[in-house]
Amino acid sequence: MFLKAVNCFNEVKDREFIAKCIRDVIMEVGPSNVVQVVTNNAPVCKAAGLIIEAEFPSIYWTPCVVHTLNLALKNICAAKDTEKNSIVYKECSWITRVADDAMFIKNFVMGHSMRLSIFTSFSPLKLLSVASTRFASTIVMLRRFKLLKTGLQQMVISEQWSSYKDDDVQKAQFVKDTLLDDNWWEKVDYILSFTNPIYDVLRRTDTEAACLHLVYEMWDSMIEDVKKAIYTHEGISNAEISTFHQVVHAILIDRWTKSSTPLHCLAHSLNPRYYSIEWLSEDPNRVPPHQDIELTDEREKCFRRVFPDADERRTVNIEFANFSDGREGFGNLDAIVDRDKMDPKTWWLVHGARAPLLQKVALKLLAQPCSSSCCERNWSTYSFIHSLKRNKMAPHRAEALVFVHSNLRLLSRNTPQYHQEETKMWDVAGDEFGSLDDSGFLEVANLSLDEPGLEAGFINNI
């Protein structure tokens, strides 16, 4: 639910101000009804989150997983040439060069109506000018280039391209040489292959759906899949060392270390699927959460904050022992079989009554999101309501309109029409009503990475 907007005119957006805004909302809904506060990873937001944690020990500040992954991709795909970052730049600078080449080609083709006309005659799809504010913008652009490979190559070997003289010959030749260079396309394929696991996690977490309990496993699997892609491309065994993988791995681990919280570990530990034989047998290295030392330490930290009373904490620890070991009613056949068959929240509703304290915590955590994507849609809603042409609206009036629009949109998601035909997922692309024609330029800053099936359909229809 969208609660309210805050007029920050003439306010200093420091940690105290942000903490006050968050505190006011917490008091409005009640501290006992708040599990976490999700923000981006900006230092001022982190500082505000720590203030909130100090005042409300049972509430966690959680950095947005999508923003964290986007920062990791930026560290990899746009490494800075600094003294402290010299090793990363040495291993990853080739990615930046490939991305820069793609950006140059895109600008060259889209920057002139004649070149754009030649391109559109060879491809039914349009080139996308991806906003840098969009998550994984470099990867999105390269994925689009991969789809357009045949059309781009046909364009530069066509008679129209060769006969068009009123242009920069050197730049046109560079574009032609690059697009016909198999080595360049192999680099594009390599970038997409090892970043694909990261991109997949971005798509799965960039949503308002409950996925906090999935984050720990997704990160773990993502890191392994990235390693597999790099080692496969380099043709080396797991026993050998890849310096490029070491750099990428260090970036991902560093981002996970900075963004993970005990709440992620507790939510993971309360997912019945991770105790099922089916899940454990998928990988010989997997162990149930109660046998993992890191998860155990973080879970105990979380319990100490959520249950400050020692007797209550002892009770919930006993309940967790029964749940994780399949005792005291959790060991009946239905409860064990349903671990892998049921949605985690449904499982706790059906089988969790024997552990009332743990059930209450589980139902809260299994309903939590892990990103701030929903807030970004509210920003686009406000931008639509308060624009250059409609700029005399009082703040309270604009807030009321955003409140009504945002909550009506959320309510519409529960209607059958939201999942059918012309109105299917109508709000995924945000609230922009600008033309998508004219120059073939598409600004997709507000296009979410969630609903992957719709994303493909939305882009391919342009």
Model features per residue range: what roles?
Residues 33-35, 48-159, 238, 242-245, ...:
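Surface-exposed, charged/polar loop-rich segments
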